[in-house]
Curated annotation (Swiss-Prot):
The lineage of its organism: Bacteria, Pseudomonadati, Pseudomonadota, Gammaproteobacteria, Pasteurellales. GO terms for molecular function: D-tyrosyl-tRNA(Tyr) deacylase activity; Gly-tRNA(Ala) deacylase activity; Ser(Gly)-tRNA(Ala) hydrolase activity; tRNA binding. It is an enzyme of class 3 (hydrolase). Belongs to the DTD family. HAMAP family: Deacylase_Dtd (MF_00518). This is D-aminoacyl-tRNA deacylase. The keyword NAD does not apply.
Amino acid sequence: MIGLIQRVKSANVRVEQQIVGQIEQGLLVLLGVKQGDDQSKADKLLQKVLNYRVFADQQGKMNLNVQQAGGSLLIVSQFTLAADTQKGLRPSFSRGASPADAKALYDYFHQQAALHIHTETGQFAADMQVSLQNDGPVTFWLQV
């Protein structure tokens, strides 16, 4: 399971011109689900996302996690993160989970995150437009 996290000052996601998820300060989490991923991996990734120290403390060091910084999560499904780009000029998506399995884990990840922090989401498998104001920019690829 892959989480590409970006520290943001604000972010939103639109489907058919309508905002379906929006946060101010926090993390935009682009979530990719691979074959073989399960709830255990989702739990590990969520703990990493929640506890990764990417926000500045009073001394300006990245010492605070998203909860300590008073932030939120915007979780957006991103199946292309699981792409195999090793060969040729066209990505292969054979490593990605099936749509049904990916949706189940995406929903699980969101439900578990919402137990700990204010969480907004995109719409699974929709054509989405994601807008964000990067803070830094600070971007990390987390994989479990």
